[in-house]
């Protein structure tokens, strides 16, 4: 069974995809596939960040501290 990559590993993978696409030297079909993969990674990374924020909010609230979250 494959282990899930860390946030940092997934972020690096997204950065690699972006660099590859920005180079403009990728065939169209590959560029489309890489773009789709990048979008999935981006959404996954965003979800991870949102979950981390929720966890921190819970920890802070459990501590009795007041917090203010801006959306």
Swiss-Prot record:
It catalyses: Exonucleolytic cleavage in either 5'- to 3'- or 3'- to 5'-direction to yield nucleoside 5'-phosphates. Coiled coil: none annotated. One of its GO terms (molecular function) is exodeoxyribonuclease VII activity. Heterooligomer composed of large and small subunits. Bidirectionally degrades single-stranded DNA into large acid-insoluble oligonucleotides, which are then degraded further into small acid-soluble oligonucleotides. One of its GO terms (cellular component) is cytosol. PANTHER family: EXODEOXYRIBONUCLEASE 7 SMALL SUBUNIT (PTHR34137:SF1). It is found in: Cytoplasm. The gene is xseB. Keywords: Cytoplasm, Exonuclease, Hydrolase, Nuclease. It holds the Pfam family Exonuc_VII_S. One of its GO terms (biological process) is DNA catabolic process. This is Exodeoxyribonuclease 7 small subunit.
């Amino acid at each position: 069974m494959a282990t899930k990559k860390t946030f940092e590993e997934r972020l690096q993978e997204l950065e690699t995809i972006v660099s590859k696409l920005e180079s403009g030297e990728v065939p169209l079909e590959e560029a489309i596939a890489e773009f789709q993969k990048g979008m999935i990674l981006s959404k996954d990374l965003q979800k991870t960040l949102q979950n981390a924020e929720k966890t921190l909010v819970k920890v802070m609230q459990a501590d009795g501290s007041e917090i203010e979250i801006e959306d």
